[in-house]
């Protein structure tokens, strides 16, 4: 008997050694599969309950849609830049969406997007102290991975952020898409500040919101993460 919505993977092999070998060979794929299952559950929940503040402002000002968690009620909206947060004392999650013209064929590269991120955040997210601002912590390395969402390219960037001139920092993840109709690049990013606790669940929740980003022409499309099941060992 399984719980509703529970996902079970059965491994069948002629002997224990084969199962161990298969599990070691496909360890990352198996973990990724279950992570994506959890991501789809979070996406499904966000499609049922989400922040109307974020949805309405993004649709009217940037002409995009995104289902942020319902407790994202604090926001700042400027030209081509939107910020929202749950403003929590513990487990703070923030969301930003910004756009810029698509003019450079090297846009979808780690180097370009890190530089663009730093310039945009320096201008739009000042810290609490004079002269402080958010930057990418490049010393820890940044991971850039191209994926396909609903048949279209999306650049996923993961890394750490830090507040220049302050002691704050934490993880971030961003999705970068090309809005072909409007010849612009759209970046949606979530970041977490939770020095007192594990950040994994907060990051997964904010990343689920990024998967709900819809550009003009996609507003009616369903959103899910593609589930890649490891192939059978021959």
Please report, for each region that a protein language model flagged, where it lies by residue.
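Signature of long, low-cysteine stretches enriched in small and polar/charged residues
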Residues: 1-13, 17, 123-182, 197, ...
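Long, acidic/polar, low-complexity amphipathic helices and coiled-coil-like
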Residues: 1-59
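Extracellular structured ligand-interaction cores
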Residues: 6, 61-63, 69-71, 81, ...
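Active-site-proximal beta-strand/loop segments in catalytic clefts of secreted hydrolases
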Residues: 11-13, 100, 189-192
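Surface-exposed amphipathic alpha-helical segments
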Residues: 21-44, 66, 72, 185-234
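Short glycine-rich, low-complexity/disordered patches
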Residues: 36-53, 123-141, 222-228
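N-terminal "mature-domain start" segment
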Residues: 47-76, 213
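Secretory pathway targeting signatures of secreted, lumenal, and periplasmic proteins
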Residues: 69-128
């Amino acid at each position: 008997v399984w719980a509703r919505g529970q996902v079970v993977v059965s491994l069948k092999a002629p002997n224990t050694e084969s199962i161990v070998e298969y599990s070691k060979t496909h360890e990352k794929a198996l973990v990724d599969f279950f992570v994506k299952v959890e991501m789809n559950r979070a996406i499904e929940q966000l499609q049922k309950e989400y922040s109307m503040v974020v949805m309405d402002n993004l649709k009217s000002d940037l002409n995009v849609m995104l289902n942020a968690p319902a407790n994202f009620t604090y926001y700042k909206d400027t030209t081509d830049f939107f910020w929202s947060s749950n403003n929590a004392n513990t487990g703070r999650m923030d969301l930003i969406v910004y756009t810029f013209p698509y003019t450079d064929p090297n846009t979808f590269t780690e180097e370009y997007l890190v530089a663009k991120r730093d310039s945009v955040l320096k201008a739009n997210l000042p810290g609490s102290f004079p002269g402080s601002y958010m930057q990418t912590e490049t010393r820890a390395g940044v991971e850039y991975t191209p994926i396909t969402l609903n048949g279209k390219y999306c650049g996923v960037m993961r890394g750490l952020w830090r507040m220049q001139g302050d002691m704050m920092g934490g993880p971030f993840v961003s999705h970068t898409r090309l809005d072909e109709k409007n010849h612009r690049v759209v970046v949606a990013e979530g970041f977490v500040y939770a020095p007192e606790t594990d950040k994994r669940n907060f990051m997964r929740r904010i990343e689920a919101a990024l998967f709900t980003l819809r550009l003009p022409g996609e507003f009616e499309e369903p959103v899910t993460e593609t589930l890649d099941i490891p192939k059978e060992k021959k």
